[in-house]
């Protein structure tokens, strides 16, 4: 047990990265197929005797089709369901979508709005289905985050846990001015390897991170990567957050500060709670793109989230 220090060249609070694609290659059919093959073969390890449901919406159809086409080459029991995009994250999908997820051995959900925290998703996993949601996925993010070696990503997760798993305290610094210390306490570290092979298991894709809900945190963290509502920050743009006793006390950016203040009026102190310390382990992600789903997974980066963390072991 002891204290660990992390120095990160790039640092973000729940934000994301832009891989540089040569002209004309973004969304290339071959690249998209390679990424789909990773999801079906490496992540799900789908079997010929299994059933799978690919559920998508009107705005993510090309990604859904790529996943379905690869799945249909593995099993004759592959279902494709498309519906209009929801209005917000966490909105329940239409009943036929929920039924398809629940009745399958495996599911993949590339959708505009997240199905991660829906009754439909949890009911599917409780019924024994294993699967992944891909909220807000784009072809660029799909290729950058899934055309990768997920066995290597899982190994990298284990390496990071070996280094940090027994630490009582973790200090994060970077040249932009981040200097924040987390007390881990008895909180459990989690790993998101993207290997979804056990009945009832669930993940986001692209995957690749280890994370913990810290018991306490104090200091300053400076975001120089991705931060909503701004997306990918400019080269000289940074946002700073002051943290005391596990809560954000000051934010340098007016737009973000207003968002957090509005959330606090609705949910109270949970809006300022320092919810998560995460470390990216996806060795296939070379650059930030401005998508939280991908950027927080980039190997060698650190992300911090504020908000409710009960689902990952917080209070």
Regions found by a protein language model. Give the residues of each.
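Short polybasic amphipathic segments
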Residues: 168-173, 239-242, 251, 302
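A broadly conserved detector of short glycine/acidic/proline-rich loop/turn motifs that flank catalytic sites
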Residues: 58, 176, 186, 225-227, ...
